[in-house]
Amino acid sequence: MSDQLTLTAETRERGGKGASRELRRNGRVPAVVYGGKEEPLMIHVEEKLLMKQLMTGHFMNSVVMIEVGGKQIRTLPKDVAFHPVKDRPIHADFLRIAKDATVQVAVPVVFQNEEKSPGLKRGGVLNIVRHELELVCDADNIPDEIAIDVTGFDIGDSIHISNVTLPKGVESAITDRDFTIATIVAPSALKSSDGDTTKDEGEDAAEGGDEA
């Protein structure tokens, strides 16, 4: 389960591009807290602290307690916008959540036991279709990552959501199909060799036809 994080914030009186630019010049990131049947709350947070939490790797699927005005607001990060050139955060959105809330989050996947995959041992390539899974779970039970065991998978095999064992209390947000997460594909050298073989066989057949 992801650790709970804390962000100290201050309220901001003005919105708009001019006010936001001024905040960024002072090392602050404008943000908004919304949801929970309450009015949106405009805040700003320290850029360095936000960057530090983003670098944990699980910020977007962690409960973040925002401390502002002497109280704490329980939230889930929903979006962080970055400057297209400087790669610095320029805005953040947070969703208010109740303590017993059920949330939908994107959780990264990791692949295990690659040395036990016949396809990968033969030089196959793990083609990842989904780097994250959309999951539904309690806010206090968000996984850091989902481990996927590739033991026994061969070249040409696909790994579907039905092949994945999710933690207790965690479900896939997509329930209408058995979607693909990854496939094991043949290496380029093997594909090329197969193609040459097919080509040779075709030429042989054509020559045989001429002789007839």
Curated annotation (Swiss-Prot):
Keywords of this protein's UniProt record, alphabetized? Ribonucleoprotein, Ribosomal protein, RNA-binding, rRNA-binding
- Ribosomal protein: is it a keyword of this entry? yes
One term under GO cellular component: cytosolic large ribosomal subunit
* Cross-referenced Pfam families: Ribosomal_L25p (PF01386), Ribosomal_TL5_C (PF14693)
The protein's matches in Gene3D superfamilies, at most eight in alphabetical order, are given as: Ribosomal protein L25, beta domain (2.170.120.20), Ribosomal Protein L25, Chain P (2.40.240.10)
Question: In what ranges is there compositional bias, type Acidic residues?
Answer: 201-212
Concerning CDD domains, the annotation shows:
Ribosomal_L25_TL5_CTC
Q: Which InterPro entries match?
A: Rbsml_bL25/Gln-tRNA_synth_N, Ribosomal_bL25/Gln-tRNA_synth, Ribosomal_bL25_b-dom, Ribosomal_bL25_C, Ribosomal_bL25_long, Ribosomal_L25_dom, Ribosomal_uL5_bac-type
Biased composition of type Basic and acidic residues is found at 10-23
- GO biological-process terms attached to the record: translation
Question: Where does the record place the region Disordered?
Answer: 1-23, 190-212
Q: Tell me, what is one Gene Ontology molecular-function annotation carried by this entry?
A: structural constituent of ribosome
User: Any keyword Ribonucleoprotein?
Assistant: yes
Q: What is the protein's quaternary organization?
A: Part of the 50S ribosomal subunit; part of the 5S rRNA/L5/L18/L25 subcomplex. Contacts the 5S rRNA. Binds to the 5S rRNA independently of L5 and L18.
Question: PANTHER family from the entry?
Answer: RIBOSOMAL PROTEIN L25/GLN-TRNA SYNTHETASE, ANTI-CODON-BINDING DOMAIN-CONTAINING PROTEIN, RIBOSOMAL PROTEIN L25_GLN-TRNA SYNTHETASE, ANTI-CODON-BINDING DOMAIN-CONTAINING PROTEIN
- Protein role: This is one of the proteins that binds to the 5S RNA in the ribosome where it forms part of the central protuberance.
Describe the family membership recorded for this protein in Swiss-Prot or TrEMBL: Belongs to the bacterial ribosomal protein bL25 family. CTC subfamily.
Output this protein's name.
Large ribosomal subunit protein bL25
